[in-house]
Regions:
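N-terminal Rossmann NAD(P)H-binding glycine-rich loop of SDR-like oxidoreductase domains
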Residues: 3-23
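NAD(P)H-binding glycine-rich loop region in Rossmannoid oxidoreductase-like domains
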Residues: 35-39, 43-88, 96
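Conserved catalytic-site region of short-chain dehydrogenase/reductase
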Residues: 75, 111-121, 166-175
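Conserved Rossmann-fold NAD(P)-dependent oxidoreductase catalytic core, especially the SDR/UDP-sugar
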Residues: 88-136
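A conserved pocket-lining segment of Rossmann-fold NAD(P)-dependent short-chain dehydrogenase/reductase
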Residues: 128-132, 180-200, 204, 216
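Substrate-positioning beta->alpha
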Residues: 143, 174-176, 193-213, 220
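Conserved beta-loop-beta element that borders a ligand/cofactor-binding pocket
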Residues: 146-169
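Mid/C-terminal beta-alpha module of Rossmann-like enzyme folds, strongest
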Residues: 208-273, 291, 296, 304-324
Length: 324
């Protein structure tokens, strides 16, 4: 079976590709020219753009399964690039897959595609899409997911996966969440805010994707969650792994909003970590996201949070992203 993977150079992609190779799939990967991660000599590399319909027809031609990971993540309120990549790019992939006879389209959506409220009810696959969000990233992921499920009845069998906050090893870029872990380890975040995320290990995401490929179920959607942990929990686990002391102070959200620009100047990396969008996401993150359906139908069993953090820090050390 040949599998074509967009977003192959991202955090999930660099964990998924080895899993596919180990399971004897032929892999064609959409590669960014500026990627500096593993070479994957067994993989057919394809240079193209999800915004170029013609190149995506060539990319999907001959593939049995397409895994659409490519997306623009943004923690800014407005992001024209997120709208373009996450909506138009997904539309191009769907059209190309239909035209070239792809037999299974696995779409990576996000927890952000779904309405967060009501917070006091379990969040699962029945939660409404966040199509009216005033945040471009959230709305773009909701619209992309809507398009995929709509095509499901039109000749293209689909599966939708909705991971929560993804962390773990093989984070070459590193991701926004990987950078948060690095900065906490190095003591560059002087205070914390209340709130947290549902954290999930990227390796568990890769295994769930493999299970979705092998499953005969189609037209299904799966929440891929892990454990909800506060930022203070995260900082404590990082400290136990040899990182900096846990920041003493927890500041109110209005103060964090006002001081975000100061915090960002203290961080490593070019993109801002603290924005009104990212802080609000921490504040209202859902604490009860059910992965029961994925457990039942895909055999999904997320590993413990503390082990994921330990493995992530160990990987960052081995790759000289933090001092050993």
């Amino acid at each position: 079976m040949k599998i074509a993977v967009t977003g192959a150079t991202g955090h999930i992609g660099t964990n998924l590709i080895p899993t596919l190779i180990q399971n004897h799939f032929e892999v064609r990967a959409l590669i960014h020219q500026d990627f500096h991660g593993p070479e994957f000599p067994q993989v057919e590399k394809f240079k193209g753009d999800v915004l170029d319909p013609e190149s995506m027809e060539k990319f999907t031609d001959g593939a049995d399964t397409v895994i659409h990971l490519a997306a623009k993540i943004s923690i800014e309120k407005k992001s024209p690039e997120a709208l373009q990549v996450n909506i138009e790019g997904t539309r191009n992939m769907l059209r190309a897959s239909l035209k070239t006879g792809v037999r299974h389209f696995i779409h990576f959506s996000s927890i952000h595609s779904l309405k967060s409220k009501p917070l006091n009810e379990v969040l699962d696959e029945t939660r409404s899409l966040n199509l009216d969000s005033d945040t471009d990233y959230d709305r773009s992921k909701a619209e992309g997911e809507r398009m995929v499920m709509e095509v499901s009845g039109s000749g293209l069998p689909v599966t939708v996966l909705n991971p929560t906050a993804v962390i773990g090893p093989n984070d070459y870029i590193p991701s926004l969440l990987g950078r948060a872990i690095i900065n906490l380890y190095q003591g560059k975040i002087p205070s914390l805010v209340n709130g947290g995320y549902d954290w999930v290990d990227v390796r568990d995401i890769a295994e769930a994707t493999l299970a979705a490929i092998k499953s005969e179920r189609r037209g299904e959607k799966y929440m891929l969650s892990g454990e909800w942990k506060s930022m203070r929990d995260l900082a404590g686990t990082i400290h136990r792994c040899g990182g900096a002391a846990v920041p003493r102070f927890t500041i109110p959200f209005p103060v964090a909003m006002a001081g975000a620009s100061i915090l960002n100047r203290m961080m490593t990396g070019r993109e801002r970590l603290f924005t009104p969008v990212s802080l609000e996401s921490l504040r209202i993150s859902h604490r009860n996201i059910s992965h029961n359906k994925a457990a039942r139908e895909l055999g999904y069993r997320p590993r413990p949070f503390d082990g994921t953090i330990a493995d992530t820090i160990d990987w960052f050390k081995k790759n000289k992203l933090i001092a050993a």
